[in-house]
């Protein structure tokens, strides 16, 4: 049963004059949320949009090309090196591999979302969620926060919404505070967004004390247990192509029923299958194939054993199909965040022109 979040204590503040603070997010932000009773519409700046819409979700299509630039070819080839480096740096290839995975699997069982409870929200609708995720992604990108902060902020928001009644006029506040909590968890102190910056990102519609009170309310609701395993926890790699697919998974509510390990496994399978096939067959990669260590550097067996181990133990065909279908329509915010990787995905047939997102 959803519990009321005590609306009387969370009253929207009358907009104040513009703050002197000019965070990076304002320059980067091209979309704004219209927050009101039962409305959560995303509109490009300067454009009026009065009804909830997903028009900003544009199909990302790149015309087929026969050749790639040298820079793009190098970008593709470096994918394999960054995976090895990321796995090695985080201890996933050493003696602690089984311990790390076992701990994450044990923890993730405690954080599976109850979609039925989320469906009981009196005002929020699933059709509003892509706009809200876009809003969080853009703020995250504007502040240049770490990779792990974004999925944790989304997980915190989803967990809170599945336990408390949240009204439309407060959802932007909840989103920003979840990002704030996640940044405090993952970022160094100097990189955590200032309260005044988050207030300005919300166009000053909430008083500063509301951020503090909402933070405490979210933490109390989650019993202060915010170390939530996310798919990013299983993908300790450095290459953005993995995180393009990972970020795209956050837009698919039907993936809620799968634990983070299965989503992570689906991300790795999709990228490996399509990027790997492209590396092996495309003419532009011929010079790289002459390298004795192509597809992976020297530790090929160690890396592939980790990937195969994850696939055999945690792969789920339905999860992979749902995730792959979502790549047919990449959010315009993600396309702006990962321009080269979106092009790479199109070249590698990871995006389909006629694929519709599953909601």
Swiss-Prot record:
For this UniProt record, give its keywords in alphabetical order, as a comma-separated list: Cell cycle, Cell division, Cyclin
Q: Name one GO biological process term.
A: cell division
Q: Which GO terms describe its cellular component?
A: cyclin-dependent protein kinase holoenzyme complex; cytoplasm; cytosol; nucleus
- Sorted alphabetically, which InterPro entries does this protein's record hold? Cyclin, Cyclin-like_dom, Cyclin-like_sf, Cyclin_CLN, Cyclin_N
| Alphabetized GO MF terms | cyclin-dependent protein serine/threonine kinase regulator activity
| Membrane is among the record's keywords | no
Instruction: Give the signal peptide range.
Output: none
Short name of one Pfam family:
Cyclin_N
Q: Does the keyword Cell division apply?
A: yes
Q: Which family does it belong to?
A: Belongs to the cyclin family.
Function, in words: Function in exit from the mitotic cycle. Contributes to negative regulation of the timing of sexual development in fission yeast, and functions at the transition between cycling and non-cycling cells. Interacts with protein kinase A.
Q: What protein does this entry describe?
A: Cyclin puc1
Question: From which organism does this entry originate?
Answer: Schizosaccharomyces pombe (strain 972 / ATCC 24843) (Fission yeast)
């Amino acid at each position: 049963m959803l519990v009321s979040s005590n609306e009387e204590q969370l009253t929207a503040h009358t907009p104040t004059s513009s703050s002197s603070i000019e965070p990076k997010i304002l320059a980067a932000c091209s979309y704004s949320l219209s927050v009101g009773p039962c409305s959560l519409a995303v509109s490009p700046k300067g454009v009026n949009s009065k009804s909830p819409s997903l028009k900003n979700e544009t199909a990302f299509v790149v015309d087929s090309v026969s050749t790639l630039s040298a820079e793009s070819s190098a970008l593709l080839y470096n994918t394999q090196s960054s995976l090895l480096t990321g796995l090695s740096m985080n201890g996933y290839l050493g003696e602690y591999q089984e311990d790390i995975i076992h701990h994450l699997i044990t923890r993730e069982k405690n954080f599976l979302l109850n979609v039925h409870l989320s469906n009981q929200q009196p005002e929020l609708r699933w059709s509003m969620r892509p706009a809200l995720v876009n809003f969080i992604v853009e703020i995250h990108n504007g502040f240049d926060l770490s990779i792990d902060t974004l999925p944790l902020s989304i997980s915190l928001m989803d967990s809170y919404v599945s336990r408390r009644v949240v009204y439309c006029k407060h959802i932007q506040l909840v989103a920003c505070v979840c990002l704030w909590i996640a940044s405090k968890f993952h970022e160094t102190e100097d990189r955590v967004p200032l309260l005044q910056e988050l207030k300005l990102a919300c166009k000053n519609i909430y008083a500063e004390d509301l951020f503090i009170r909402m933070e405490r309310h979210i933490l109390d609701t989650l019993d202060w247990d915010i170390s939530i395993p996310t798919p990013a926890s299983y993908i300790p790699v450095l290459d953005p192509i993995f995180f393009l697919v990972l970020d795209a998974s956050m837009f698919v509510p039907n993936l809620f029923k799968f634990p983070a390990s299965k989503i992570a496994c689906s991300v790795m399978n999709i990228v490996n299958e399509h990027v790997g096939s492209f590396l092996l067959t495309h003419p532009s990669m011929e010079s790289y194939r002459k390298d004795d260590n192509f597809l992976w550097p020297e530790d090929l067996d160690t890396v592939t054993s980790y990937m195969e181990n994850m696939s055999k133990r945690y792969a789920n065909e339905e999860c992979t199909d749902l995730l792959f279908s979502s790549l047919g329509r990449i959010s315009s915010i993600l396309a702006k965040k990962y321009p080269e990787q979106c092009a790479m995905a199109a070249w590698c047939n990871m995006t389909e022109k006629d694929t519709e997102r599953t909601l």
